[in-house]
Amino acid sequence: LSFNLHRNVVFKNADVPGQPLGYMEYSKPENLWKGLDKYCNEDTNCESLTIPHNSNMSGDMMFRRDKFNVQRTDFTPDYVQLRNKYEPLLELYQHKGGSECQRGGKNGADEFCEFEKFPFNNLIADRFNGFLTGEPGEQSFLRYALAEGLNQENIHGTNPFKYGVVGSTDTHLGTPGLVDEVEYLGHGGAGADNGGGSEVATGLTDLISF
């Protein structure tokens, strides 16, 4: 159902692995971190971190481990240390909605939980008018992760969700400062959403799931 679980991988310098760590070989988050441990380390003068985004559209899977293995293995000391090492940041806001807290969650009314909420829990839903989706659950949001991180620290001695937060546009234009709403070029640069009646450029898309 196209749950959003991918990460941005950011390298400190130009010393990077010889080839990308692709999904076919590293389909689970912890396998990505293990691959970085193997190919991007002190011996290769390489350093990196991963930044997950759109946890609100992860189908309650972003902060779980048992969903990614047949054995339903939960958190272990090695896992929480690995995640703590490679994932110090979380993207909290972008144009696919806020990932801080669930709308109408168990803690009651909170204006921050009503702001910029995307009504789907996966990336494919907007193409089918909400079909194949539901409201994002509590486990898709940062506040859940922060509390669960403290719980795991009590158990394993390390907090896997000790996050700083970032906000971004999530456009695919390579222009992080291009945030003018009047001249908005759209998510993919086609300009379909700028209200000016301009034609959509061939080969570009402005689907929110792009």
For each predicted feature, which ranges?
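Extended, charged catalytic domains and RNA/DNA-binding interfaces, predominantly
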Residues: 1-210
